[in-house]
């Protein structure tokens, strides 16, 4: 079995829902989060009823120019900058990670580590899953797709409940929804903001400052937020009995 990536202290994630300049705003959000990752950068957005993306190796300013942003024309977007370390530094492992399932698309950007990744991957491969990367992030999408038989919200809850570790996710659906997920310990940061009536999610509030978004709150430990054109819904899963923090988040 191919080993997963080595642990990363931090990556940067950003998402915005229902804004006419979603991709350019995500670009600037990632630019503000560049200190969290310099290995690769990517943005996913919607075209019609599917998700398209552009990603590459290097800094945000190296990966994107106006021609790329003009193609990424959807009203919702998620983005990712990846922490640089030795090993697995290949474009295949750049995020957001995109999957298509039964005429729908999902793209996920992930910060953190899933410590039971090997066990879950073995289980998923035994049941027929085929992995395209060495990212533990991909495990979440495989779990999510398998749990969709229980409905969209329960698929999120059931999938997150299987994960152990320190993590936060932003996910884009082909319906234009943005989902934010925070681990039960609240180990990895994820902030909620507003920009001219649109909701934004980011690893740090410095991304809000650059795009002139208003900070609303930090997501609670174990919280899932589902953001669509009609508004926002919060799902509180079971948080850990104590909150934990990552020392690297305070450097």
Pin down the residues of each PLM region.
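Conserved short alpha-helical segments that host acidic/polar catalytic motifs at enzyme active sites
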Residues: 1-251
């Amino acid at each position: 079995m191919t080993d997963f990536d080595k642990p990363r202290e931090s990556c940067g994630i950003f998402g915005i829902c229902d804004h006419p300049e979603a991709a350019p705003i995500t670009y600037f959000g990632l630019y503000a989060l560049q200190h969290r990752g310099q290995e690769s950068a990517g943005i996913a957005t919607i075209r019609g009823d599917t998700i398209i993306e552009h990603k590459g190796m290097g800094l945000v300013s190296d990966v994107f120019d106006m021609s790329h942003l003009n193609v990424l024309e959807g009203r919702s977007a998620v983005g990712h900058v990846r922490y640089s370390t030795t090993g697995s530094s290949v474009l295949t492992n750049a995020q957001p990670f995109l999957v298509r399932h039964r005429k729908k698309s999902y793209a996920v950007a992930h910060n953190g580590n899933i410590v039971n990744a090997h066990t879950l991957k073995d289980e998923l491969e035994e049941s027929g899953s085929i992995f395209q990367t060495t990212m533990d992030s991909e495990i979440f999408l495989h779990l999510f797709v398998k749990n969709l038989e229980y409905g969209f919200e329960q698929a999120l809850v059931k999938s997150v409940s299987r994960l152990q570790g320190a993590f936060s996710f932003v996910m884009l659906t082909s319906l234009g929804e943005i989902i934010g997920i925070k681990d039960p310990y609240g180990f990895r940061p994820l902030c909620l903001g507003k920009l001219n009536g649109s909701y934004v999610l980011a690893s740090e509030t410095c991304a809000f400052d650059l795009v002139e978004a208003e900070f609303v709150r930090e997501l609670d430990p174990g919280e899932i937020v589902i953001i669509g054109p009609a508004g926002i819904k919060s799902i509180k899963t079971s948080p850990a009995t104590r909150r934990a923090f990552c020392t690297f988040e305070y450097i």
